[in-house]
Amino acid sequence: MLPNDINMLVSFLNTKLRDDDMSLEHLLEINDINLNEFMTRLDRNGYFFDENNNQIKVK
């Protein structure tokens, strides 16, 4: 089960992105998370996805 808290979720996903070397799209897909909804949630909470570094960051 994924963390519901946005900060914990970002930490979890960044760890998976780094350790498992996968794309955000694939990681969200295997965890049954809608990409567009997730990107909106990131934005609402002051985060963005840095494609060059494959990492979720604070705005």
Please describe what each predicted stretch is.
Residues 22, 58-59:
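Charged low-complexity stretches with an acidic bias
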Residues 1-23:
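N-terminal acidic leader/helix
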Residues 29-58:
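Short, charge-rich amphipathic interface segments used for partner binding and complex assembly
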